[in-house]
């Protein structure tokens, strides 16, 4: 891997290790020409990720992008090594600026190498790669926004409506390693999915991650772009910010703590109860809940508010049993053990003080 200590290189190196590849040679700026020669001569697969995108002098584009790629191809050809080569290029290769020209000429050099030697070659024109270990003010706006917002530093946005296309580093890495077991036809290949958004939407989403600690309302962070952005944002948190506190409401019955809220999938909480304490004694019309006793022994009582039908059950911590509250049934939960009881609670909606859908009524009048 050339550029092994860069953003993509680090992620790729870790993934290769996870897959059991133990003979990975990393080439960095600290490596000598002899190191590069030896690594390429014996390589079974080459990931050429090294390049220059923010040089001190514009001439470094040609040297670090075109020149280095030509060197890689020459060493491989002279060694008679027809190992497959992946080139990390850029969508800017389609542009006629110094950087774009240098990347396009690097592509041409690799494609010519493949044609001349028969070696499989793969060119990835990547766009705004983001993810953990990216560098702020260098790799992408995502890295800069995540770094600054995680630290309370202002970000600058000139045009919130400006479009931006993104690709997640994990998806890039999976495309790369996929070639090790399932080769594709030589030429231009893609890594995806690619996500289309705007600079303003990107900033708002990341700001929302930071604000969620106070509001406890988390975005839909389980799929797609938001999932990848959330993981990237968290990777920029300094260690002293890995933990945060939420409000704990305490009274003679025990504690109640709201932990996590979602826009449309309810909220998670937990509560404690001292021995003999009864909570609840109310019913709902639409609101529903799931209870799981984590510690202690609970007695649940239910009464249908119209027919008067009664039901009761007992559950203990460690049983992994969920008890649901049913609309139209008043219910309570009593700690019938000798120690503190701890109960996890999910409700299907965020508590609304204006419309609580909670009406007091004892199970046993």
Regions of interest found by a model, annotated:
Residues 108-135, 146-147, 153-162:
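Conserved beta-loop-beta element that borders a ligand/cofactor-binding pocket
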Residues 1-17:
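N-terminal Rossmann NAD(P)H-binding glycine-rich loop of SDR-like oxidoreductase domains
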Residues 30-79, 92-96:
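NAD(P)H-binding glycine-rich loop region in Rossmannoid oxidoreductase-like domains
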Residues 242-281:
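A short glycine-rich, His/Asp/Glu-containing loop-to-beta-strand
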Residues 305-327:
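Short acidic-glycine-tyrosine-enriched beta hairpin
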Residues 136-144, 161-180, 200-204:
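Substrate-positioning beta->alpha
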Residues 2, 70-108, 112-117, 121-124:
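Conserved Rossmann-fold NAD(P)-dependent oxidoreductase catalytic core, especially the SDR/UDP-sugar
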Residues 178-248:
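Mid/C-terminal beta-alpha module of Rossmann-like enzyme folds, strongest
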């Amino acid at each position: 891997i050339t550029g092994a200590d860069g953003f993509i290189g680090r992620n790729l190196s870790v993934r290769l290790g996870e897959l059991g590849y133990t003979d990975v040679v990393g080439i960095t700026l600290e490596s000598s020409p002899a190191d590069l020669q030896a690594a390429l001569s014996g390589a079974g697969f080459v990931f050429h990720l090294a390049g220059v995108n923010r040089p001190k002098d514009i001439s470094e584009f040609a040297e670090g992008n075109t020149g280095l790629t030509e060197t890689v191809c020459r060493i491989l050809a002279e060694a008679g090594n027809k190992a497959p080569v992946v080139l990390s290029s850029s969508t800017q290769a389609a542009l006629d600026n110094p950087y774009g020209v240098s990347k396009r000429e690097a592509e041409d050099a690799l494609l010519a190498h493949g044609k001349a030697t028969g070696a499989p070659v793969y060119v990835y024109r990547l766009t705004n790669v983001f993810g953990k270990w990216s560098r702020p003010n260098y790799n992408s706006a995502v890295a800069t926004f995540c770094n600054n917002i995680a630290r309370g530093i202002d970000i600058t946005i000139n045009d919130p409506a400006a479009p931006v296309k993104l690709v997640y580093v994990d998806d890039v890495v999976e495309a790369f390693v996929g070639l090790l077991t399932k080769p594709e036809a030589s030429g231009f290949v893609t890594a995806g999915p690619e996500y289309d958004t705007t600079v303003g939407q990107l900033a708002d989403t990341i700001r929302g991650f930071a604000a969620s600690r106070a509001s406890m309302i988390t975005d839909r962070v389980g799929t797609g772009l938001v999932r990848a952005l959330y993981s990237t944002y968290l990777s920029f948190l300094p260690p002293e910010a890995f933990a945060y506190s939420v409000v704990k409401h305490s009274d003679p019955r025990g504690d109640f703590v709201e932990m996590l809220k979602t826009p449309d999938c309810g909220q998670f909480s937990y509560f404690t109860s001292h021995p003999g304490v009864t909570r609840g004694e109310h019913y709902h019309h639409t609101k529903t809940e799931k209870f799981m006793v984590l510690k202690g022994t609970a007695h649940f009582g239910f009464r249908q508010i119209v027919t008067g039908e009664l039901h009761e059950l007992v559950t203990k911590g460690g049983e992994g049993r969920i008890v649901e509250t049913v609309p139209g049934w008043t219910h309570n939960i009593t700690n019938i053990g000798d120690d503190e009881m701890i109960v996890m609670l999910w409700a299907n909606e965020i508590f609304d003080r204006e419309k609580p859908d909670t009406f007091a009524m004892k199970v046993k009048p």
